[in-house]
Amino acid sequence: MIIAIDGPAASGKGTLGKRLAAHYGYRHLDTGVIYRAVAKALLDQGAELTDETRAVAAAEALDPDTFADPALKSQTVGEAASVVSALPRVRAALLNFQRQFAAHPPGAVLDGRDIGTVICPEADVKIFVVADASVRAHRRTLEALARGEPADEAQVLADILKRDERDKSRAAAPLKAADDAHLLDNSHLDIESGVRAAIDIVEAVRAGRQRV
C-alpha cells in the first residue's frame, strides 16, 4: 500500500507521515528532506541555487545517510529548497528515487507537495493536509526556537506565504490537491487528533476496497 500525504510548509504532514508509517509498519520518506539535501549541497558549494546543472549533480549524488542532518531543518535551507525544487531537471532526477522507495513492500508513506499528483498518482490513499498560515507560522517559530535558532513569527509568516505562492505557481509539479485526495484541515487539531483523523481516512479507504 502507498499512502501519499501532500500539503504546504509546516502543515503537519511530516508528523502525520511518520506516525502513519509507524502505525502500519511501513517505511516513511519525507520527500522535502531530499530537496533540502540538494539545496544544502549547493549552499555548501557556494553555488547559485538556480544553477540547474550543479543542482542535478547534487541530486544524483544524494547520500540517504545525510537525511538526518539537523542542519537540513534550518529556515535558510528550507527557503533554498523551495527554489531548488522548482527546477524541472532536479525534480526529474529525484523522481525514480522516490518511486523506488514507494514500491518497497509491504508499503510506504511519502509526504511532500506532489506525491499524489506526480510521484505516486496511483497511491492507494491520498491525503492533502491544510492549516491556516498563521497557525503554520506559529508552529514553525516554536520549532526554530526549540532548536535554539532565533525566529521572528511575523517574518516566518511572511516567508511561509511567499513559499506557498512559489510552490503553487511553479511550472514543475505545482502544489495542489489530487482530484481524489482526502482533505484534512490540521489548523486546530493536536498531534494525536490529526493522526487519528488520518488513520480514519486510511481505514475508510481500505474498508471500501474490501467491500468491492
From Swiss-Prot:
EC class name: transferase
Entry similarity comment: Belongs to the cytidylate kinase family. Type 1 subfamily.
Keywords: ATP-binding, Cytoplasm, Kinase, Nucleotide-binding, Transferase
CDD domains per the UniProt record, alphabetical: CMPK
Superkingdom of the organism of origin: Bacteria
Stored SUPFAM superfamilies: P-loop containing nucleoside triphosphate hydrolases
Subcellular location per the Swiss-Prot or TrEMBL entry: Cytoplasm
GO cellular component, one term: cytoplasm
Binding residues for ATP: 7-15
Catalytic activity, as annotated: CMP + ATP = CDP + ADP; dCMP + ATP = dCDP + ADP
Residues passing through the membrane, by range: none
Gene3D superfamilies tied to this protein: P-loop containing nucleotide triphosphate hydrolases
Organism: Rhodopseudomonas palustris (strain BisB18)
Name of the protein this chain belongs to: Cytidylate kinase
Listed NCBIfam families: cmk
EC number: 2.7.4.25
Example GO molecular function: CMP kinase activity
Biological-process GO terms, alphabetical: pyrimidine nucleotide metabolic process
